[in-house]
Amino acid sequence: MPPGEQFPRCHTRPVATIPGVSGRVDRLSRELAEDGVDAFFVSSAVSLGYLTGMHEAGGERLLIFAVGRDGRTRMIAPALSATQAGRMGIADVRPWRDGENPMVHVDDLGRDWNLRSAVIAVDDDMPASYLLALQEALPAALFRTGQPVLSRLMRIKDQSELDLMRRAGRIADEALPAALAACTQGVTERELASILTAEMLRLGGTPTFAIVAAGANGAEPHHHSDDTPIREGDVVVLDFGCQVEGYNSDITRTIACGHATEEAREVYRLVFTAHQAARAAIRPGVPAEAIDRAAREVIARAGHGERFMHRTGHGIGLRIHEEPYIIEGNASPLEVGNCFSVEPGVYLPGQFGVRIENIVAVTSDGHESLNAEPSPELIVAS
């Protein structure tokens, strides 16, 4: 669900110490050659982190990591970042200082790699200011999105990535009891979200978001925590997550404050049943839309089909939302190493909402949950 404001990325360690990273540039260059692309220009912290382990974006200062179809690499970076780039194992770094024109280095790159009339892919997160400047510097080049190429690599996690995601999931799981203990009448959504954030930080994660939606606010899937006080009997949706070395967790649990009505318990059981039905359908080769359908059919049969108005899940990794998307119309088959959320929900306007979310990884014989299993019954915090 929505990540809200991101906390700053602050993790960096040399490529040589990050299992799996060193081969990613080679795999990307092979994909570029197969797709007829001459070079890929990366500028986002996520894409750069995936390829090099250096989680940094240039912001107002131009920072580009170029990968050629022949495997060559070069970084054009602010002098402020050049030392870090070298430490990450990037051999060819062209630094520029404030007051200098970084496009001189782009012109050199175009000449050295014969890119002046080439096909150049860029990541979808590249700032428009970067792209416009690149198009002006290389006017005969054809620029296109490179995200489909990179997504093909990023959607399949290796064991080192899965280990980091398990750790992030475990931290989120272990933060939940603090929220349960603090969920009493009068505490505000914002205060409860702050407790979750502090607990994830204490446990060693980098908090990325914490959303608390109490009572009628829980019927708004995109609600952001505010100063609404939690009341006795409120159903409360908790959606939160953290990062470990850039890899994300994302968990949603629904609880009740003090006591729960039978209607709330019934809706919770329905959503839990839909969650389990979706999980049971996960295996390699199954179309992503089949997982969505499995959850949706359970809720529709109970008469709440119109109250489940979002997709069943989204991929997750270095991005909180990435491929594969678990939605009707996505016939792409699931593959071993895909990681995504399973998060059906029912939202009753003016009353409450219920959502249950776990992150799963597709395995050869089904799936693995990367965080603890949800309760089959609505938990009452007292």
Task: List each model region and its residues.
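Active-site neighborhoods and metal-handling regions in enzymes and metal-associated proteins
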Residues: 2-382
